[in-house]
A protein has these predicted regions:
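Anaerobic metallocofactor- and corrinoid-dependent redox/one-carbon enzyme cores
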Residues: 1-198
Length: 198
């Protein structure tokens, strides 16, 4: 398993470690963890106490991929987003996960639909647009004709629709084949789009 458990002790350890390294490097390092699943408000409180900067916070992901009770998780998300908004924590949403399980061209509209839903749910909870890390991912087949232009168009569309949001743009994973040269090119194209549409 990757990552760390979402406990207050782990949040404290990570914050202290990143502050130490940040002091050595002369810059601030953000700490990110997840605030999802069955304990969203509780995790949001712990993250706020320990000074986390970013939290993955998306009930729709749990409904679609984990079969979590819809009503309960949407209420949990509402409470956790109130807490994250008050604490100044940026939330990340999970739209990139849709594209790892579906064709990124055929399902492109689902990402925008989910972003729009997540934006409205965040606004209802009082979360400012500047704290909405709405999700997207660079997951189209790299062999697709004009695929780079489609990726650029999708990213630019998200930037124009959500101009104040610190969008979460995820790098390519599904079509990383082990061809190192091609993988570096895919990462470079992803970075280029991220910079162009910032």
């Amino acid at each position: 398993f990757g990552g760390t458990y979402a406990t207050q002790a782990n949040f404290k350890i990570m914050r202290e470690a990143m502050d130490k390294v940040g002091e050595e490097l002369g810059r601030y390092i953000r700490v990110c963890n997840y605030c999802s699943g069955l304990c969203m408000p509780e995790i949001a409180i712990m993250g706020a106490f320990e000074g986390l900067d970013v939290m993955l916070n998306d009930a729709l992901y749990g409904i679609l991929f984990r079969d979590i009770n819809m009503q309960r998780t949407l209420i949990d998300q509402y409470m956790s987003r109130i807490i994250n908004g008050f604490a100044g924590v940026i939330i990340n949403t999970g739209e990139d996960n849709y594209l790892t399980t579906a064709d990124a061209v055929e399902a492109a509209h689902t990402v925008l639909a989910s972003d729009l839903i997540n934006e409205q749910l965040a606004l209802l909870a009082g979360l400012p647009e500047e704290q909405m890390g709405l999700g997207h991912a660079f997951e189209m087949d790299p062999m697709l004709d004009n695929g780079f232009l489609y990726e650029l168009a999708q990213a630019q569309m998200a930037r124009e629709i959500f101009p104040k949001a610190p969008l979460k743009y995820m790098p390519p994973t599904k079509f990383m084949t082990g061809n190192i040269f091609r993988g570096h090119l895919q990462d470079a194209l992803f970075n280029m789009i991220g910079i162009w549409t910032n």
